[in-house]
């Protein structure tokens, strides 16, 4: 019988790892601290929760991101299967219905005979057995400290991110806005809202002066240049 594997964290990486191992006949125990322990960034008890954007980036084979997705599909990826099933219109990108996507992942994991899902916080790395750590940037403090203790010479990376804002369709004046594709790729799934120079400058000034959401205790504002909050971009 194959040696069991313990996986810590049931986000995208943890769920995919559990799925791939389980499909190969390897027993998996998958630990997830939600819903027993939530963080300020979590809003759902479901597995595979998207805490930022609902876009999984490009789905075009002409670039590396899209090519990796196609390779994952051919490897029976759970994440890509659920994303394709619950995708929403986004031109050349792969975007999903957040809740339906996570619900599908949760049901697949819960229904797999080789996966045992455990709810609760793991405060230290298991001392025995094969273990995959997939707790991501929202790792609980005790486990993060245990990892740091075991790897004292490690370099700990982080960056400040923000949840993508949601705008209701009813709030947009479609007499002025129009649908178009993004970068002239795919279908016309994006709403374009035009501004005159005067309107743009007024918007920019208001954005720079706008009140910000309070920073959580575990965050600092070391932003990632490739995924920058719009207010930080405006102030530059």
Could you say what each language-model-derived stretch is?
Residues 4, 27, 156:
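Residues at the starts of beta-strands that form the adenosine-phosphate
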Residues 59-64, 87-104, 135-142, 191-198:
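Short beta-strand to alpha-helix junction loop
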Residues 2-13:
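Beta1/beta-strand and adjacent pyrophosphate-binding region of the FAD-binding site
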Residues 14-16, 141:
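Short glycine/serine/threonine-rich phosphate/pyrophosphate-binding segments
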Residues 64, 69, 91-125:
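A structured beta-alpha segment of the ubiquitous adenosine-cofactor-binding alpha/beta core
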Residues 19-81:
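N-terminal FAD cofactor-binding segment of flavoenzymes
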Residues 61-65, 69, 77-92, 151-161, ...:
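A short alpha-helix-loop-beta-strand transition element characteristic
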Residues 108-236:
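Predominantly flavin-linked oxidoreductase catalytic cores and closely associated redox partners
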């Amino acid at each position: 019988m194959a040696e069991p594997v313990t996986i810590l964290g049931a986000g995208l990486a943890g769920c995919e790892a559990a799925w791939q191992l389980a499909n190969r006949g390897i027993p998996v125990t998958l630990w997830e601290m939600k819903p027993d322990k939530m963080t300020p960034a979590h809003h759902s008890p479901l597995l595979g929760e998207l805490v930022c954007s609902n876009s999984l980036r490009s789905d075009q084979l002409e670039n590396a991101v899209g090519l990796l997705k196609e390779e994952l599909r051919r490897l029976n990826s759970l994440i890509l299967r659920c994303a394709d099933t619950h995708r929403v219109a986004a031109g050349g990108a792969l975007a999903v219905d957040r809740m339906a996507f996570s619900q599908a992942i949760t049901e697949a994991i819960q229904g797999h005979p080789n996966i045992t899902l455990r709810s609760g916080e793991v405060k230290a790395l298991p001392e025995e057995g094969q273990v995959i750590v997939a707790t991501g940037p929202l790792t609980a403090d005790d486990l993060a400290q245990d990892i740091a203790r075991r790897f004292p010479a490690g370099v700990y990376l982080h960056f400040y991110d923000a949840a993508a804002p949601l705008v209701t369709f009813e709030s947009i004046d479609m007499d002025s806005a129009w649908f178009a594709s993004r970068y002239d790729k795919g279908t016309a799934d994006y709403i374009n809202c035009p501004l005159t120079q005067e309107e743009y400058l007024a918007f920019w000034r208001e954005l720079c002066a706008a009140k910000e959401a309070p920073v959580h205790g575990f965050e600092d504002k070391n932003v990632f240049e490739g995924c920058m909050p719009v207010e930080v971009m405006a102030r530059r």
